[in-house]
From Swiss-Prot:
<feature type="binding site">
    <location>
        <position position="414"/>
    </location>
    <ligand>
        <name>ATP</name>
    </ligand>
</feature>
<dbReference type="InterPro" id="IPR001844">
    <property type="entry name" value="Cpn60/GroEL"/>
</dbReference>
<keyword id="KW-0547">Nucleotide-binding</keyword>
<dbReference type="Pfam" id="PF00118">
    <property type="entry name" value="Cpn60_TCP1"/>
</dbReference>
<keyword id="KW-0413">Isomerase</keyword>
<keyword id="KW-0963">Cytoplasm</keyword>
<dbReference type="GO" id="GO:1990220">
    <property type="term" value="C:GroEL-GroES complex"/>
</dbReference>
<comment type="subunit">
    <text>Forms a cylinder of 14 subunits composed of two heptameric rings stacked back-to-back. Interacts with the co-chaperonin GroES.</text>
</comment>
<dbReference type="InterPro" id="IPR027409">
    <property type="entry name" value="GroEL-like_apical_dom_sf"/>
</dbReference>
<feature type="binding site">
    <location>
        <begin position="477"/>
        <end position="479"/>
    </location>
    <ligand>
        <name>ATP</name>
    </ligand>
</feature>
<dbReference type="InterPro" id="IPR002423">
    <property type="entry name" value="Cpn60/GroEL/TCP-1"/>
</dbReference>
<feature type="binding site">
    <location>
        <position position="50"/>
    </location>
    <ligand>
        <name>ATP</name>
    </ligand>
</feature>
<dbReference type="InterPro" id="IPR027413">
    <property type="entry name" value="GROEL-like_equatorial_sf"/>
</dbReference>
<keyword id="KW-0143">Chaperone</keyword>
<dbReference type="GO" id="GO:0005524">
    <property type="term" value="F:ATP binding"/>
</dbReference>
<dbReference type="GO" id="GO:0016853">
    <property type="term" value="F:isomerase activity"/>
</dbReference>
<dbReference type="GO" id="GO:0009408">
    <property type="term" value="P:response to heat"/>
</dbReference>
Amino acid sequence: MAKDIEYNETARRKLLEGVNKLANAVKVTLGPKGRNVVIDKKFGAPTITKDGVTVAKEIELEDPLENMGAQMVKEVSTKTNDVAGDGTTTATILAQSIINEGLKNVTAGANPMSLKRGIDKAVTAAVESIQKRAVKIENKKDIANVASISANNDNTIGNLIADAMDKVGKDGVITVEEAKSIETTLDVVEGMQFDRGYISPYMVTDAESMVATLNDPFILIYDKKISSMKDLIHILEKVAQAGKPLVIISEEVEGEALATIVVNTLRKTISCVAVKAPGFGDRRKSMLEDIAILTGGQVISEDLGMKLENTTLQMLGRANKVTVDKENTTIIEGKGQTKEIQGRIGQIKKQIEDTTSEYDREKLQERLAKLAGGVAVIHVGAATEVEMKEKKARVEDALSATRAAVEEGIVPGGGLTLLKAQEAVGSLKLDGDEATGAKIIFRALEEPIRMITSNAGLEGSVIVEHAKAKKGNEGFNALTMVWEDMIQAGVVDPAKVVRSALQNAASIGSMILTTEVTITDKPDKDAPNPMAGMGGGGMGGMGGMM
């Protein structure tokens, strides 16, 4: 296919137009007084959102060159969202400012590579300034403040997320689901839970609720099918002699083995529940290993030369309680060694860092949470489906931002931290075009606060000058329209969000500034229209239908 090739200023100007089209659509959502964006959907009701990344993801431009610029800035918001969960609009505004100011200088004859070096040095100085201002999160109130701000100042969501983190810990799994009612609620499941229920309903201990509850049981973890009774009989006898219940987790329990377990359970000879192992393939092996470490047992695996009939009580796991219903199994207070559990948690965290697959990362995070203790589910309720989707997106954003805050601490919000980072950038000793590159960042750092106040209906430049003159953490709260200490007022951002927004914006900004050539597919003017000849006449033979 033929290509369109554009050079120098022509290429950069087109990219800039695309950048501005996307950024101008995204930046109206910034701040507590940010406006809504309504997005048309092919099917169903339109989406109404104040989430920058949701707006950015919807934008595709007709002109291929402009679209390239827009897609590059879209990368800024999606990358920031992936890393920190919030700050997408801030990142887009920073990128727009860096690109606009930078291209003015490139057009005026500045060397793009020298500008890039200056930008990189200025960003490093600004990031150090952000990290110095960061305050570690100590209490539930701080967590609630961060979550509320990320959820567009919704205190209900903020408090729910703070409660969830309080109950399951900062590494615990918190999932967000749609509720069946209009209430937004929090449910917490303690211990490790996986989505496999009992193999036979005859194993339940409470026929009314159809749940099997076993106190202080032994747990047999086996990675193959159990069908022969002779493999299982001696372990059942040993457990019965010990006077304890037994939980069997294996690929499958069937045939005479299942019949024997059911008969002995009904006769009350032994209390035993069999469940299928969670997951599939290699992931199943890993999850069985997790359960073994959590309960202090071993996976009886024929791959390692172990035989089921040779299993001893010492190889079985233990837990304070196991509850099994039709669909889920929950292991509460497994009796594994804390040191081994922590080692396994560290190993999974390393795998999360190393994996490139989004799906694998999600599954690893689920495993991490199950080991780290507890699963909290936030059920998001709303009156309409449109509101439900918008609210659910805000809860997910707030959750990610809160995790980021716990990780790297919080800084004053409202664009103040970026503005104060100007001091660090201004003190750099640079010459020539490198100094110009640093000035580009210096100017960009005041754009978020300018936009927040502009969206609140005030003159941004006036607020920026006042904010520069203020000391400490005093800034302008656009929600209450007063000057106050931002941290005490609860107007805070996670340091990781602010840092990621600046670094990602500078990265893409530098890429566009150093672009000299663009290559796009030339539109094929002679392409036949697939719908040609189908219009006007209707379908033959259908004339009598009118």
